[in-house]
Amino acid sequence: DIGQGANTVMVQICADALGISASKFDLVMGDTDLTADAGKTSASRQTFVSGKAAQLAGERLRAKIIHLAEVSDRAAIHIEGEKLTAKDETGEHLIILSDILPQENGDVLTGEGTFDPPTTPLDENRQGSPYATYGFGAQIAEVEVDTSLGTTKVLRIAAAHDVGKTINPTQVEGQIHGGIAQGLGLALMEEYIQEVSENLHDYLMPTVGDMPSIEVMLIEDPEPLGPYGAKGIGEHALIPTAPAILGGIKHATGVAIHHLPATPDR
């Protein structure tokens, strides 16, 4: 988790798969002695890839509990301390975790999940499936241009994004707001010039005062491979923002900007 809320989403997904409250989870992250190498945080892959692994882990742990308690798949599972109960139409079945012989690492019951999205390389005709799924989105920007000073202010952005299935609406909207903020910086102010942009006085970044009004529309077209139909929303929130802003500038002034950022001199 690098700030996008992946830890919360992983727990939510696993809790749903296992069938217990997320409050019963104790998340361990970044411990190479306990956690497997799941790859890097990039390419909108955490909810889709790691989330699917979390779902599979929860489902496998639930299957073990169901088998141990000898209850139906519809059983409700509850845990309090070392007591695990599974209740279905036949009654309530109690499992005392301390009565179970622990594994070498001290764990009593475990569920593990891995997910490697299916892909196929491009053939000689450039046909194939290099990625398991794709994100889609569209943004519209309303801008105000001062033709005397050459400055641009973004007034409003409407963003519609297909997220497959929304796991955590607040975090999804926050991710889109963050992408738009980065896109705003890309479009209007962020530029690195060697020996000039040496600090944040010379390398400008958006502040809360630069942010426009944002309207987010979440489109849910479930992705069969993703956890409960979800897919990532990382780059997809950033990519359309600058083109939308530049389109607004051209519509207002007739000037096409071909080099970012769109500073007054350009």
Predicted region positions:
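Conserved strand-to-helix beginnings and helix N-cap segments that scaffold or border functional pockets
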Residues: 7-8
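C-terminal catalytic domains of large/alpha subunits in multi-subunit enzymes
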Residues: 12-266
